[in-house]
């Protein structure tokens, strides 16, 4: 494999010294970029974009041409696993992802096939290996999956939801059925992420996008415990380097202490949790990632710089000089001016030097 020219992202996740704060952005390859929209138009639709190796590689690399980012993230979707399990993923304009089938009964769970990620999701693995090769060691490549809880919400609801009516009904009325589904999904995610690592992913993020919809005990029982199982089942070293794992529960800032028990190397934060508070809670046991409100990028250059500097001041307030990766607190939105993220990225690199230089 090609020698990695910029490894500060991996080093920060492992709480090793860095020369400047590494940064990447959730959803950095996305609709806010005109070149992304052009490529998606060529592909025809979102799923075709994900499943075409050449297009998936192209859109992964696009933000790296514009911004001085310290990591690339595989362009794909968290719902590839449910799709491969036979639920029939499709997208309706303005309504987000939907499935032709739902999973709502014990028999539905029993009918789910065992995932063979290398065969069933070969297009993802082809994309990972192609992107890794195209990067040429420029920056590390992040692989990812949704958490079992988050995947289950889509599978039970049949698409996106704000109330999770059917999933929570299952959780309280038939918890054993939900546990069976989550266990099946945890095994699927382990296979999927290990296949990504074999294909060339150098770090992993688990997106627990809907963990924040749960009460405390339910979060631990139905989300966190399954992420713990996944991390215990992952290949943690490849080509002589550790494969760091990031857990990101949106709305999960109150659960940092239990999250540490997952075995993750780093915890992602949304913008509702102050970084200095989070630093004090984790006390150097894990790295942190985040957590600029994506809406900040709607502002002026001066307001973006001010917000980024305040974020970095919080991140380094307790004197720690590493164990931090700058990011947004959630995905960048399609309405952001492509000029604005450059201000974010450059300010992170320039201003953090006062703490790390």
Swiss-Prot record:
Q: In which pathway does it act?
A: Porphyrin-containing compound metabolism; protoporphyrin-IX biosynthesis; coproporphyrinogen-III from 5-aminolevulinate: step 4/4
Which residues are involved in binding substrate? 27-31, 77, 154, 209, 330
Q: Does the keyword Zinc apply?
A: no
The cellular location(s) given in this protein's UniProt record come to: Cytoplasm
| EC supergroup of this enzyme | lyase
Site features described as Transition state stabilizer, chain residue numbers: 77
User: Which Pfam families does the record match to this protein?
Assistant: URO-D
Question: What InterPro entries does the entry give?
Answer: UROD/MetE-like_sf, Uroporphyrinogen_deCO2ase_HemE, Uroporphyrinogen_deCOase
Coiled-coil regions listed: none
Q: What is its EC number?
A: 4.1.1.37
- A single MF term (Gene Ontology): uroporphyrinogen decarboxylase activity
Primary role: Catalyzes the decarboxylation of four acetate groups of uroporphyrinogen-III to yield coproporphyrinogen-III.
Which family is it part of?
Belongs to the uroporphyrinogen decarboxylase family.
- UniProt-listed PANTHER family: METHYLTETRAHYDROFOLATE:HOMOCYSTEINE METHYLTRANSFERASE RELATED (PTHR21091), UROPORPHYRINOGEN DECARBOXYLASE (PTHR21091:SF169)
Q: Spell out the subunit comment.
A: Homodimer.
What is the protein's given name?
Uroporphyrinogen decarboxylase
């Amino acid at each position: 494999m090609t020698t990695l020219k910029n490894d500060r992202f991996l080093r920060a996740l492992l709480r090793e010294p860095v020369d400047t704060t590494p940064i990447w952005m959730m959803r950095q390859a996305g609709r806010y970029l005109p070149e992304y929209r052009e490529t998606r138009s060529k592909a025809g639709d979102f799923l075709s974009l994900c499943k075409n190796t050449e297009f998936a590689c192209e859109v992964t690399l696009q933000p790296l041409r514009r911004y001085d980012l310290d990591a690339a993230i595989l362009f794909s979707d968290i719902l590839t696993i449910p799709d491969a399990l036979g639920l029939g993923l499709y997208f309706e304009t303005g309504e987000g992802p939907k499935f032709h089938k739902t999973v709502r009964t014990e028999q539905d769970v029993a009918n789910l096939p065992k995932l063979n990620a290398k065969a069933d999701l070969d297009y993802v693995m082809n994309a990972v290996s192609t992107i890794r090769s195209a990067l040429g060691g420029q920056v590390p490549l992040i692989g990812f999956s949704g958490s079992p809880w988050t995947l289950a919400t889509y599978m039970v609801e049949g698409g996106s939801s704000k109330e999770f009516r059917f999933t929570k009904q299952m959780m309280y009325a038939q918890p054993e059925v939900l546990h069976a589904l989550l266990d099946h999904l945890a095994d699927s995610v382990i296979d999927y992420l290990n296949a990504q690592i074999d294909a060339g992913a150098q770090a992993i993020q688990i997106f627990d996008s809907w963990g924040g919809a749960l009460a405390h005990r339910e979060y631990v029982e139905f989300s966190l415990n399954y992420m713990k199982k996944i991390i215990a089942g992952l290949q943690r070293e490849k080509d002589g380097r550790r494969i760091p794992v990031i857990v990101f529960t949106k709305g999960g800032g109150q659960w940092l202490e239990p999250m540490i028990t997952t075995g993750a190397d780093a915890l992602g934060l949304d913008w509702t949790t102050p970084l200095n508070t989070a630093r004090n809670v984790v006390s150097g046991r894990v790295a942190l990632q985040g957590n600029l409100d994506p809406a900040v990028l709607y502002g002026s250059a001066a307001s973006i710089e001010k917000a980024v500097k305040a974020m970095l001041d919080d991140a380094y307030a307790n004197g720690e000089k590493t164990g931090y990766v700058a990011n947004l607190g959630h995905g960048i939105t399609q309405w952001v001016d492509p000029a604005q993220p450059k201000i974010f990225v450059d300010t992170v690199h320039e201003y953090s030097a006062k703490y790390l230089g």
